[in-house]
Amino acid sequence: MMKAILIAAATILQAYLLGSVDTGILVSKFVYHDDVRNHGSGAAGMTNMLRTFGKKAAAMTATGDVLKGVLAVCIGRWLFHMLPADAGVSPYLGVYLAAIFAVLGHLYPLYFGFKGGKGVLVAAGAILSIQPVLLPFLAIIFLVCLIPTGMVSLGSVAMAALYPVLTIIYGSLQGYAAGDMLVCAIGSGFMSGMVIYMHRANIQRIREGKEYRFGKHNKK
């Protein structure tokens, strides 16, 4: 029991600390000698980096954010593999603990005054490591929302909202045990909720018709 608690704590800690390494802030400060959080939406994610510093900055940010999600989950999986097979712990607990706290670290980074990004790409990196088969479906959902509207935020919220649904469908098709299904449902639900919560201002602007649209005329 104590070993399981220590492993869970180590998983949470490493994921949060990795998540706190905010690529957007680092790139904006060390490459562009500025802080992206002082511009645009105030977030430190790829979208605001693209709007503020351009495609190269956005690409570097996206790569870093996805990789830290992948790495956090891989470490969490490795740590939980140290538990004996008869420990009665779902193998999905480690990966979802890592995913959730990597996203949390990105949202509230320890090293940067607890003000970071919105977690979409970190979550995508985590999903790439947990259930890569879901990413094409999530990408389609994103594009279906983005292409006609130009709103990245709408695509992000739609992906987040439907991720738990896709997770449950996938788990059912794969014949997950009840305990594993519960962990996956709760874990994906937490990830979804965090991303949607961080987009609450965007959701309000969408309702008011004021949300930023890429490639379209934006009202001032």
Enumerate the predicted regions with their spans:
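Cytosolic, membrane-interface loops and tails of multi-pass inner-membrane proteins
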Residues: 25-58, 204-220
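Short, non-helical or kinked segments that cap or interrupt transmembrane helices
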Residues: 35-43, 111-124, 151-162
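C-terminal membrane-associated helical module and adjoining short loops/tails
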Residues: 176-178, 183-220
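Interfacial segments of multi-pass membrane proteins
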Residues: 50-55, 76-80, 101, 119-149, ...
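Helix-coil boundary and interhelical linker segments in multi-pass alpha-helical membrane proteins
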Residues: 1-10, 74-96, 128-135, 169-186
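C-terminal ends of transmembrane helices
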Residues: 24-27, 105-115, 141-150, 200-204
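Alpha-helical transmembrane segments in multi-pass membrane proteins
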Residues: 7, 11, 15-20, 24, ...
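Loop-to-transmembrane alpha-helix initiation sites
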Residues: 136-138, 152-160, 178-188
